[in-house]
UniProtKB/Swiss-Prot annotation:
Highest taxon in the source lineage: Bacteria
Enzyme's top EC category: hydrolase
GO biological process, one term: rescue of stalled ribosome
Swiss-Prot/TrEMBL keywords: Cytoplasm, Hydrolase, RNA-binding, tRNA-binding
GO function term, MF aspect, one: peptidyl-tRNA hydrolase activity
Pfam families assigned to the protein according to its UniProt record, in alphabetical order: Pept_tRNA_hydro (PF01195)
Protein family per UniProt: Belongs to the PTH family.
Name under which the protein is recorded: Peptidyl-tRNA hydrolase
Lineage: Bacteria, Pseudomonadati, Acidobacteriota, Terriglobia, Bryobacterales
Site (Stabilizes the basic form of H active site to accept a proton): 91
Compartmental location: Cytoplasm
HAMAP family: Pept_tRNA_hydro_bact
EC number: 3.1.1.29
InterPro entries: Pept_tRNA_hydro, Pept_tRNA_hydro_CS, Pept_tRNA_hydro_sf
Length: 196
């Protein structure tokens, strides 16, 4: 079984913030494949189902971003999921808006949610899907930017970006990380270089 985990923050006020892109991708997969992500388990909302013939668990840790590992590690242990079948999906301020980068391993690169996951699993060999959110112009505070609502003018691009990311995650489960990297490590089609 795959564990497809989107990182984010619980609460309506964060629902459409850049920091919650991971949650939005999990929601898109849930919608596409009729999986209800409503069951509480190990400080996460989870849903079990099938994507393209593969058993999956979709998860949205409810611990707040910086404690994500506190939810995912017990969840994996309880359900006996191999770490090679974990895919973590999250926002990345180091990448431009609309860029997607799949990596099979590596550091957290300053992302506190991923840092927590690496600390709990005691390995950096974790597949991750990084979703670029940098607006292409200087920002005063990264912390404020990632928690503020995404602009209404960006909603169409957001929808396309989330769909592109969901397809990337599907490809990881169906065809493997290498093929997914070849197909999806780029900007989502139809997105502008600058913030709208």
């Amino acid at each position: 079984m795959f564990l497809l985990a989107g990182l984010g923050n619980p609460g309506e006020q964060y629902a459409l913030s850049p920091h919650n892109l991971g949650f939005l991708v999990v929601d898109r997969l849930a919608e596409q494949f009729g999986i209800r992500v409503t069951r509480k388990d190990s400080k996460a909302l989870i849903g079990l189902g099938e994507i393209d013939g593969h058993q999956v668990m979709l998860a949205k840790p409810q611990t707040f971003m910086n404690l994500s590992g506190e939810s995912l590690a017990p969840l994996m242990e309880k359900h006996q999921i191999e770490i090679s079948n974990l895919v973590v999906i999250y926002d990345e301020l180091d990448l431009p808006w609309g860029a997607l980068k799949i990596k099979p391993k590596g550091s957290a690169a300053g992302h506190n949610g991923m840092k927590s996951v690496i600390q709990w699993f005691k390995t950096s060999e974790i597949v991750r899907v990084r979703l670029g959110i940098h607006p292409g112009h200087p920002i005063r505070s990264g912390a404020e930017f990632v928690l503020a609502p995404i602009k209404r003018s960006q909603m169409k691009e957001l929808d396309e970006f989330v769909g592109f990311a969901a397809d990337a995650v599907r490809t990881i489960t169906a065809e493997g990380v290498e093929k997914a990297m070849t197909k999806f490590n780029r900007r989502a089609p139809g997105l502008n270089n600058e913030e709208a």
